[in-house]
Amino acid sequence: MLVGEAGVGKSAIVEAIVHSIINKTCPEKFYGFNVIEVSVNSMISGTKYRGEFEKKADDLIQYIESHDKLIIFIDEIHQIFGAGSCEDSGVDLSGALKPLLARDKAIFIGATTVDDYQRSFSRDSAMKRRFQPVYVREPSIQDVPKMIMSKLEELMKFHKITVSSDVLKYTTIVAKAMNSNAKNPDLTLDVLDRAMTIAEMRGCKRLSKEHVKMVFAENYKMLNTMDEEEKKVVAWHEAGHFVAMLLSSHIVDQKLILASIFPTGDANGITLFEATDKIASYDDAYIEERVGRLLAGRISQGFIRKGYDAGAISDLEIATKWLTDRIMKYGMDEEFMNISLFAVCDDQNKLILTESDKQKIMLIAKRKVDEIYKKTEKLLLENKDIIELVAGELLKEGVVTASQIKEKLKK
């Protein structure tokens, strides 16, 4: 069972399996296997009356029963629960498939989101036992180009447009900067498809960075409406977050990716991080670096401008709330531990605190934020030249990656 957010490449994994079988790069025991994709939506479509869905389900089961060496892929597999049981039809596809799953007649691969997996499979423990969940995380920006190569070749053939490795790398960076909520590899593929359509309409044979920029014309338009002073403040703000993470040594569960000053609707700029496979210790050093990173934008823009805008105010609010939550969860403070000794817990083991205790915790958090603020300010002042470098690149290009800055610092 492939479990992950929409767009992270669950179907791409199955396509890679197909290619490995065709090219015989898979384990020898899978030579000669056929991969069949089952669309639950197609099976349900038009099955209003009794017997129509049962006929489709029976045909599928008979096909599987009469063939060997099959891998059955069901995308959005959570739809099998209740599929076919609407109106006059009383058969559920999950029930129809259970005998096959019990006999291991074929290899079944399902794909769904985390929420749909938990919501649907929690209702049927027997079905849940038949699938081993494999959690699929969004690939890193560095891994996207090689991951989408086969799909990119299809797009190039369809649009009759070639894409250089330089433009491909640029697209993965810009796409994520402009739409951080969408997931790769689907995000980059969608942007490439749209950019290649633009290039094709203009009679071009090669995709350029300008074609990619046209996909995000609205973002560029919003950036161009900002005056130079406003751009500079945003650049220094994001550079602060960027450099604080660049200099960190204890935030091992996250990796710095990029910073951008392009307005995205939610904010005027963004600094992005990716999760790593490492586990954070949540000790004092880790907590201080996390809070310091949250405050760094506010501190950095203060180097060039007096007063605080909405972004700087938000930094302080988020840092204080984040630290307050961690103090309540992990302790971190002798004074808080004295408070929690006398607190009671509810049925979910959460502390029930009096208003007086809550006020004390808020004061503890504020005091610690002030301490971390001073430490982070000192660190950033000592590395102001790096902040200036990052801000300069942001003002010039709009987007800068961690690898680009690390390369410049080597020189």
Task: Pin down the residues of each PLM region.
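A short helix-turn-beta junction within AAA+ P-loop NTPase domains corresponding to the substrate/partner-engaging
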Residues: 122-137
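Soluble catalytic regions of large protease machineries
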Residues: 231-238, 242-411
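Walker A/P-loop
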Residues: 1-29
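Short glycine-rich substrate-engagement loop in P-loop NTPases that contacts/grips substrate
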Residues: 36-64
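Conserved catalytic/switch belt of AAA+ P-loop NTPases
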Residues: 61-62, 74-107, 115-126
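Conserved C-terminal helix/linker of AAA+ ATPases
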Residues: 32, 114-117, 163-168, 184-220, ...
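Short conserved motifs of the RecA-like P-loop NTPase core
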Residues: 148-149, 160-179, 211, 216, ...
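AAA+ ATPase "lid" subdomain C-terminal helix
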Residues: 157-158, 173-186, 190-207, 220-225, ...
